[in-house]
Curated annotation (Swiss-Prot):
NCBIfam families: PRK05282.1. The active site is at S123 (charge relay system), D138 (charge relay system), H160 (charge relay system). This is Peptidase E. InterPro entries: Class_I_gatase-like, Peptidase_S51, Peptidase_S51_dipeptidase-E. Transmembrane segments: none annotated. The lineage of its organism: Bacteria, Pseudomonadati, Pseudomonadota, Gammaproteobacteria, Pasteurellales. Gene3D superfamilies: 3.40.50.880. One of its GO terms (cellular component) is cytoplasm. It catalyses: Dipeptidase E catalyzes the hydrolysis of dipeptides Asp-|-Xaa. It does not act on peptides with N-terminal Glu, Asn or Gln, nor does it cleave isoaspartyl peptides. It comes from Actinobacillus pleuropneumoniae serotype 3 (strain JL03). One of its GO terms (molecular function) is serine-type peptidase activity.
Length: 234
């Protein structure tokens, strides 16, 4: 059974890096102390893979996990196949997906997660768990072979969702950008995840975690609000 924790971001309000995720992760990984976590650092454009691995190790130290970045393997895919848990960090989603294709990780991750290996990811790492990365907020600074992602959660995800416009901002709001996507892709569902929220996926059900509701947009921007602590079939 699929077991995934998809988190909107690595910070919430003024919390330190990944601190707000620790209670969720402690429960999610309660049976995995001492186990090997394959970490995918490809989204971290402004820091090296070594630096990203160290940052995540330090932030999650209390969970007593063996975190190993995939770049440590002769073949990156080897680390995925040896892992007890898979984690994908945030950053630029286009860079992330491009390198996942280059290192042939998509099928390996998909197979592991579908067979029960826990998966957690934040921001871009949540994005790529969905059907495609077409509702990311990131600039397309590089071009993956396809926008198609892992499709473990068979819908679109928009992390870091903020409703409306900031004063003085004359560009499109997030709702307007998602409306554009749904005009072109009217059969899709988009799960907009505000800061400090997460989806816990168990099999074919999802539970909303955090301090805010998650919004599900469909054709013509019809809204289905998923309340905090609610569980629904997706």
């Amino acid at each position: 059974m699929k077991n995934m924790l998809l988190m909107s971001g690595s910070k919430y309000k003024d919390t330190a890096y990944l601190v707000h995720t620790l209670p969720w992760l402690a429960q999610f990984l309660a049976d995995y102390k001492g186990k090997k976590v394959a970490f995918v650092p490809y989204a971290g454009v402004r820091r090296s893979f070594d630096e990203y691995e160290t940052a995540v190790k330090n932030a999650l130290q209390s969970l007593e996990l063996e975190i190993v970045s995939v770049h440590r393997g002769k073949q990156h895919r080897d680390i995925i196949e040896q892992a007890d848990v898979i984690a994908i960090g945030g950053g630029n989603t286009f860079c992330l997906l491009k390198q996942m294709y280059e290192h042939d990780l998509l099928d390996a991750i998909r197979a592991k997660v579908n067979s029960g290996t826990p998966y957690f990811g934040w921001s871009a790492g949540a994005n790529v768990a969905g059907s495609s990365i077409m509702t990311t907020n990131d600039m397309p600074i590089t071009y993956p072979p396809s926008f198609n992602a892992l499709n473990l959660f068979p819908h679109q995800i928009n992390p870091h969702f903020i409703s409306g416009k900031m004063q003085g901002h004359n560009g499109e709001s997030r709702e307007e950008r998602l409306e554009e996507f749904l005009i072109v892709n009217p059969q899709s569902l988009v799960y907009a995840m505000p800061e400090g929220t997460a989806l816990h996926i168990q099999g074919e059900q999802a539970t909303v975690l955090g301090a805010q509701d998650i919004l599900c947009f469909s054709e013509k921007m019809q809204l289905d609000t998923k309340a905090v602590n609610s569980t629904f079939n997706y």
